[in-house]
Every structure is written in structure tokens, then in C-alpha cells.
Amino acid sequence: MSALKTLAAALLLGGSAMAMAANDGQTRVNELLSSDPQYRETWEGVVKKEERLPEWVMNLSGTPDQQMNAVTEDGDKYLVGPLCESQDKCLNHRLIVAFSFDKKHAYAMLVDVPEGLPADKSPTRHATYRFLGKPDQGMQDLLMETLKKDPNWY
């Protein structure tokens, strides 16, 4: 019977993280803070001690590039997805965000590439990376792997 209770609790916890989806059934980074006060509280804890962050990062108010995905890192589940400053500046200013399913931890990687970079120049060689939320090496790798899934990132 306790296995059944554990399964039910896991389904409720996992389901609540996914329940705040948009009409298309997909969760996007820019919807998280308004979907649940716990997300807002956790994110504010991440950015409050950071200096010189753009407002779109502080408020997660940019343009979502794609839906968020459930990912496991070191046995813990996270909701991970990208956010762009705006649709036309996605290559230049983007944020990869990861929230734990329990909404208690959040990490991010802010990626900036100089605007006006010629098309024949690799963005990876000119990018600067800034990690938020003090992610360990495993989380940094997960955020970087999420970025590398973008076909325009080479």
C-alpha cells in the first residue's frame, strides 16, 4: 500500500510542475513566474545577489525559443528550457533555465554573443557564459548540453 501512496505522491508532484502549461500543453520559461509563487520566490533568490542582469533575465520575460523539457541530472528531475531576449536576438542574448521539480532550486546560464557577428564566425568562439544560481559542474554541463541542441549553435 505504501508503494501506491509513493506513486500517487510522485504523480501529483510531477503533474503539478507540468499542469501550468499553456493552451498548447507545453510549458515555456516565460510563463513560470506567473504560474506559481514558488517559482517566483526561487527565481528571486537566484537573481537578487547578481549584478547587472538585464530586466528580461530578472523577470524571465523574454521570448521562449521552445518548450521546456523534463530532464534528470544526478538523480534529480528538472524542468529545463531556453529563453531569448527577443525573437530577433535569440542568437545573441539567451538564457538556459533549469528549475527542480520541487521548485526549490533554479539555475541558469546567460549566453551573450556580440551583435553583428558575421555568419561565417562561430558563435561558440565569441560567446560569454554566465552561470546563475551556483550550479555544480553536472548542472553546468546540462545547461551547456541544452544550448548545444540548438541547430544554429556551432
Task: List the predicted regions and their residue ranges.
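Short beta-strand segments that buttress and anchor functional surface loops
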Residues: V80-S86, L110
